[in-house]
């Protein structure tokens, strides 16, 4: 049985991805003494949508997120806890099932213990294919899923902004950065002061996975759009330190996986022929992203991941020692699909492989 609809579905997915790449969604976990707001979720798209917080710091925190960069964030999803809440567990539990959140911040006064708890949670969510990333104060998490904000001495016209309170501004700025550009050198015109770093100190901080702001003598701006990843591996090279690269990879990986889960697995016979039709549809999706300027033209490939497929066959007791590569590709994998997609994100230094196992 063929796949008459899968190409159309991926074309629709590509169109949605291109639109979504212009701006992302910010999640905020807040605390407030207003009992009418507690344990509730609020969708905020403009200042007019901000709830009646008792704590003015929450209002400022949300307003900073709304500033964005080229665009404002698509929306802000705020989960409000009681000020008596012992931890952020309820907020994290809520966001665990919200697949459209791109960047998450803890409260404006997020403690070191709360920051650590979010890091642990974010890393576990990433293992479960979540694309949510955290923007946190002073957190050397060594992970592409955590942006480590270390800016100090920050002020705007309203007064001092702590590092934790600045995180919503950074999350909104990143979410408002189209995927075709980077947030590097993005200006923050509302800021009047930061602790200034020498060029050497700034370079050292960036190399250590810190998201910093610099003063160029005229304005305050982002030093470089990097996350907290420091330790690289053959599978996760230096390109994964860039927020822009990780954002694009997360979007592509999620789109392919969810589209396959929702429209392929269980809907069609998992035959070799159907896999080939699926692969052709995915290639069309990637080519659409090439045309939109997210991927380098002519760089995208998608094929059956023979290494993973052979490993799966061995785990089911199949002797693959005498099988050719083509026979491994055509082998029955029950309800499993193993695909290897290779893309080149514009501005990336190296080719990056995405393994999609469904």
Residue ranges and their predicted role:
Residues 26-119, 130:
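An N-terminal, globular interaction/scaffold subdomain
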Residues 1-71, 215-358:
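Structured, hydrophobic secondary-structure cores that serve as assembly/anchoring elements
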Residues 2, 27-32, 42, 93-262, ...:
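A glycine- and small-residue-enriched flexible loop/hinge signal that marks low-structured segments
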């Amino acid at each position: 049985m063929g796949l008459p609809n899968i190409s159309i579905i991926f074309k629709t997915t590509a169109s949605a991805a291109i639109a979504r790449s212009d701006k992302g969604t910010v999640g905020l976990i807040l605390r407030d003494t207003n009992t009418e707001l507690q344990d509730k979720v609020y969708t905020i798209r403009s200042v007019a949508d901000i709830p009646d917080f008792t704590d003015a710091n929450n209002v400022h925190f949300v307003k900073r997120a709304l500033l964005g960069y080229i665009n404002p964030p698509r929306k802000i999803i705020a989960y409000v806890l009681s000020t008596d809440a012992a931890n952020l567990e309820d907020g994290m539990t809520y966001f665990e099932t919200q697949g459209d959140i791109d960047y998450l911040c803890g409260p404006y006064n997020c403690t070191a213990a709360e920051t650590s708890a979010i890091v642990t949670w974010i890393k576990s969510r990433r293992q479960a294919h979540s694309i949510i990333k955290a923007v946190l104060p002073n957190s050397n998490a060594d992970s592409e899923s955590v942006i480590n904000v270390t800016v100090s001495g920050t002020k705007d016209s309203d007064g001092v902004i702590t590092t934790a309170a600045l995180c919503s501004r950074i999350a909104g700025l990143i979410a408002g950065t189209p995927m075709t550009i980077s947030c590097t050198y993005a200006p923050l015109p509302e800021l009047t002061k930061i602790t200034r770093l020498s060029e050497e100190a700034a370079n050292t901080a960036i190399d250590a996975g810190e998201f910093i702001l610099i003063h160029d003598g005229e304005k305050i701006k982002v030093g470089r759009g990097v996350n907290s990843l420091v330790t690289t591996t053959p599978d996760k090279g230096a390109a994964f330190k860039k927020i822009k690269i990780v954002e694009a990879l997360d979007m592509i990986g999620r789109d392919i996986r969810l589209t396959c889960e929702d429209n392929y697995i269980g809907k069609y016979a998992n035959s070799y022929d159907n896999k080939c039709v699926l692969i052709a549809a995915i290639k069309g999706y990637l080519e659409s992203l090439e045309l939109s300027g997210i991927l380098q033209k002519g760089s995208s490939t998608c094929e059956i991941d023979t290494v993973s497929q052979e490993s799966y066959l061995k785990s089911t007791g199949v002797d693959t020692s005498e099988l050719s590569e083509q026979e491994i590709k055509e082998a029955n994998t029950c309800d499993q699909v193993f695909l290897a997609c290779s893309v080149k994100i514009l501005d990336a230094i190296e080719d990056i492989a995405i393994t999609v196992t469904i």
